[in-house]
Amino acid sequence: MALLPILEFPDPRLRTKAVRVGVAEVVSSSFQTLLDDMFETMYAAPGIGLAATQVNVHQRFMVIDVSEEKNVPMVFINPEIVTREGDQVFQEGCLSVPGIHADVTRALSIVVRFLDRHGDEQQLTAEGLLAVCIQHEMDHLDGKLFIDYLSPLKRDMVRRKLEKQRRRAS
């Protein structure tokens, strides 16, 4: 397994809309290795979710593990939200927008349909943190970041803060 480089805002590749994954590709050994590498990268970061677009793979899949023990890895390939209910405000962060956290309103409960890592169709009802994480990672697959939900003024403040962090790091 290998750690993959994570793209960081404002990298324009984060704005790319991902394409669907074919079932034949899902079961290939190279795709399975990529999934394993994504989990390793997510856990090492550390994070609870990672979309393929964040590692410069522009296909519709993501890996998630919101468990405390990091022992419930979940794969979502070609995910689609079937229903959304209620609203919740959650403070989100992102591996592609390091050091930034902001309140984002998302659906409280969702039903998502997807393929699992074996190419089998699944449907899952998710609430709370898992629902937030699924919606956040699905946004990445559409080229959207959590900071896009912020006002233009707050987004500009985030951009300046990240530029300052980068200057300090170099």
Swiss-Prot record:
It is an enzyme of class 3 (hydrolase). Pfam families: Pep_deformylase. Coiled coil: none annotated. InterPro entries: Peptide_deformylase, Peptide_deformylase_sf. It catalyses: N-terminal N-formyl-L-methionyl-[peptide] + H2O = N-terminal L-methionyl-[peptide] + formate. GO terms for molecular function: metal ion binding; peptide deformylase activity. Its EC number is 3.5.1.88. The active site is at residue 137. CDD domains: Pep_deformylase. Its cofactor is Fe(2+). This is Peptide deformylase. It comes from Xylella fastidiosa (strain Temecula1 / ATCC 700964).
